[in-house]
């Protein structure tokens, strides 16, 4: 799950503070030529004696610099939402000022200019504030239309919706609210509880303060939220087919075949590696042809190998089972053209 990156407000201070007074923006005003922002009172007082931007020295206007500045309502709303208690303190200072100087009039002033706008009307929230919300089951668009028709006909009073009211801190997330509903209603783990604002599902990491800022709720009533219960999505796991890797034996038969492929058959062995020498005719190229003949014990039944099996050569061993020698007793074998004794 992807979450939003949380950063400290001190990292945003260079973008929220006025370079002239060193405080947060109050009535933020932006210069059109260079888009640098300042407090309205600060920049108006500065341009009375200067015609250049205090940050980049761009000429604002040759004769009337006040024509090149604009009120930045969006930036001011961002500052009020990011800095806790700033809007409330500013409105209090304005009310105190006009209370101390009752004869002072505000030309074309609004309620906000006079400090008569409450924090609830502005929609600003703090982390420690308590938010009143209503939660009810989401019935869908079709059920809501049917319910509306019943209400218009006068039959809707018989059905009462299960609306519940809660008081929660503004910093509480949607995930915590969903867990609360799951525990309250004993929802099994195979189902998920989803929170909605009207018909739009909410992200789990949204706080109640985020919902108040994103959606058109002006604190003139409880925050209207809805919930629905849906089956949890299960991830499909595809079965993995094991693929035999090269050089690995999967059975005893394959191991036997690999050994038999490496060891040659007795019929194609050279004379030096023959395991059936003849005492009458020494093998050509063998060490016994240049020296005294070696004596070999004779056995009534010479060793033989069954078809499909291999004999140990050069000190090698075989892990295959050998058949009894009686199966190959009638087979004739020759070594270098000389018949072997039976």
Curated annotation (Swiss-Prot):
ZnF (RING-type) residues: 18-57
PTM entry text? Phosphorylated. Homodimer formation is regulated by phosphorylation with only unphosphorylated proteins forming homodimers.
**Which residue positions does Phosphothreonine occur at?**
237, 334
Presence of keyword Transmembrane helix: no
The GO terms describing molecular function are: chromatin binding; DNA binding; zinc ion binding
In what tissue types does this protein appear? Expressed in embryonic stem cells. Expressed in a variety of tumor cells and in neural tissues.
* Composition-biased stretches (Low complexity): 263-318
Q: Name one Pfam family in it.
A: RAWUL
Q: Which GO terms describe its biological process?
A: anterior/posterior pattern specification; apoptotic signaling pathway; cellular response to hydrogen peroxide; chromatin organization; chromatin remodeling; embryonic skeletal system development; embryonic skeletal system morphogenesis; in utero embryonic development
Which intervals of this chain are the motif Nuclear localization signal?
81-95
Q: Which UniProt keywords apply?
A: DNA-binding, Isopeptide bond, Metal-binding, Nucleus, Phosphoprotein, Repressor, Transcription, Transcription regulation, Ubl conjugation, Zinc, Zinc-finger
What this protein is reported to do is described as: Transcriptional repressor. Binds specifically to the DNA sequence 5'-GACTNGACT-3'. Has tumor suppressor activity. May play a role in control of cell proliferation and/or neural cell development. Regulates proliferation of early T progenitor cells by maintaining expression of HES1. Also plays a role in antero-posterior specification of the axial skeleton and negative regulation of the self-renewal activity of hematopoietic stem cells.
**What is the protein name for this chain?**
Polycomb group RING finger protein 2
Q: Which organism is it from?
A: Mus musculus
Which gene is this protein's source? Pcgf2
């Amino acid at each position: 799950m992807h979450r939003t990156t949380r950063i400290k407000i001190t990292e945003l201070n260079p973008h929220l503070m006025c370079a002239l007074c060193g405080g947060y923006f109050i009535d933020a005003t932006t210069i059109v030529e260079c888009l640098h922002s300042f407090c309205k009172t600060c920049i108006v007082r500065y341009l009375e004696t200067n015609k250049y931007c205090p940050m980049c020295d761009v000429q604002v206007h040759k004769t009337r610099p006040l024509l090149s500045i604009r009120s930045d309502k969006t930036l001011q709303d961002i500052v009020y939402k990011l800095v806790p208690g700033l809007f409330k303190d500013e409105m209090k200072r304005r009310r105190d000022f006009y209370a101390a100087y009752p004869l002072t009039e505000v030309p074309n002033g609004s309620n906000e200019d006079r400090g008569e706008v409450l924090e609830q009307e502005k929609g600003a929230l703090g982390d420690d504030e308590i938010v009143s919300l209503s939660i009810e089951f989401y019935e869908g668009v079709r059920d809501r239309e049917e319910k509306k028709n019943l209400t218009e006909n006068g039959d809707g009073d018989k059905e009462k919706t299960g609306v519940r009211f809660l008081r929660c801190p503004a910093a509480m997330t949607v995930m915590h609210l969903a867990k609360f509903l799951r525990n309250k209603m004993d929802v099994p783990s195979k189902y998920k509880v989803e929170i909605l604002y009207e018909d739009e599902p909410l992200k789990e990491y949204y706080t109640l303060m985020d919902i108040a800022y994103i959606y058109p709720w002006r604190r003139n009533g409880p925050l209207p939220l809805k919930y629905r219960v849906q089956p949890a999505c299960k991830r499909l796991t595809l079965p993995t087919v094991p693929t035999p890797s090269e050089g690995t034996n999967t059975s005893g038969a394959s191991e036997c075949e690999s050994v038999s492929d490496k060891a040659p058959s007795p019929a194609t062995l050279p004379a030096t590696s023959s395991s059936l020498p003849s005492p009458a005719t020494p093998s050509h190229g063998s060490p016994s042809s240049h020296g005294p003949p070696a004596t070999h014990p004779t056995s009534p039944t010479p060793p033989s190998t069954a078809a499909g099996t291999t004999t140990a050569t050069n000190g090698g061993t075989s892990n295959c089972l050998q058949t009894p020698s009686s199966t190959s007793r009638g087979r004739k074998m020759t070594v270098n053209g000389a018949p072997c004794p039976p």
